[in-house]
């Protein structure tokens, strides 16, 4: 037996010891705890708005904090800011590269960002004096595609990349403040905690990591998925996270218990998950799938309680408004739909 094989076995044994130690701390299962909870019942949501205007696949969307405006990015090379109440386009921003994979709305509403196969994160000022929207910064240091970006405030943004790293940027100087190293596969998705001090990342190494923005360190690593993690989000109280993977499951991990609580899967679901988001209370989990649907799960009982079907292609992105009143889904069919 080679030395590598020996080390591999040793690593597996150590991983098993960690898993056993975690299990020993779990004095009760989530299923036991929530057995007394009332059943959610069928969740039926209708399409209230369809946002038409993109001419190609939509890859990403993100709500503004006002729960009214949202930004979407498409392969047609446009970044569009929409008014979801009227379905009007507030801004249509032509991009230098049409290979866009992510977009983000700043909490202040002053900026939007996007990036993709150009390996850059481009920041656009929506409130410029001239009235036209233009690039205010191009953040380039990643050596792989930009998979996700999220603002912390008007001067700080976190990015994840196909180069396996995440980075915190100072937008004013255009420099990376911190590089977060630890994943062994492409970083696919990130989400920022409600207090903006932590963020989580999901990667193609099938693990999710919790990072401390201020210290620049990895706090926790969560494993259990059998394939790439494509999507990740925080539970509304910031004390748990949910991941969506190509293994056709979503998983809920508790940060304090340091382990997986529940797995959302069904034998009839065999395709990967592209996007995940919680309702305002956290009781419902929305997950977008490659089979053109968005499933609604009871996050406490891991039962499927609804389905949003209306797209003619893969649901690539989704988001719940800050006020919890609506869900938006974006798809490769070039449309965005607003549901409630």
From Swiss-Prot:
Ranges occupied by WD repeats: 53-83, 95-125, 141-170, 182-212, 224-254, 268-298, 310-340
SUPFAM superfamilies per the UniProt record, alphabetical: WD40 repeat-like (SSF50978)
Keyword entries, A-Z: Congenital stationary night blindness, Disease variant, Repeat, Transducer, WD repeat
Transmembrane segments: none
Signal peptide (from-to): none
Pfam family, one: WD40_Gbeta
Gene Ontology MF annotations: GTPase activity; GTPase binding; signaling receptor complex adaptor activity; spectrin binding
Cellular component terms (Gene Ontology): cell body; cytoplasm; cytosol; dendrite; extracellular exosome; heterotrimeric G-protein complex; plasma membrane
GO BP term, pick one: regulation of fat cell differentiation
Disease per record: Night blindness, congenital stationary, 1H: A form of congenital stationary night blindness, a non-progressive retinal disorder characterized by impaired night vision or in dim light, with good vision only on bright days. CSNB1H patients present with childhood-onset night blindness and middle age-onset photophobia, but have near-normal vision and do not exhibit nystagmus or high myopia. CSNB1H inheritance is autosomal recessive.
Role of this protein: Guanine nucleotide-binding proteins (G proteins) are involved as a modulator or transducer in various transmembrane signaling systems. The beta and gamma chains are required for the GTPase activity, for replacement of GDP by GTP, and for G protein-effector interaction.
Family: Belongs to the WD repeat G protein beta family.
Quaternary structure annotation from Swiss-Prot or TrEMBL: G proteins are composed of 3 units, alpha, beta and gamma. Interacts with RASD2.
Protein name: Guanine nucleotide-binding protein G(I)/G(S)/G(T) subunit beta-3
Organism name: Homo sapiens
Gene it is expressed from: GNB3
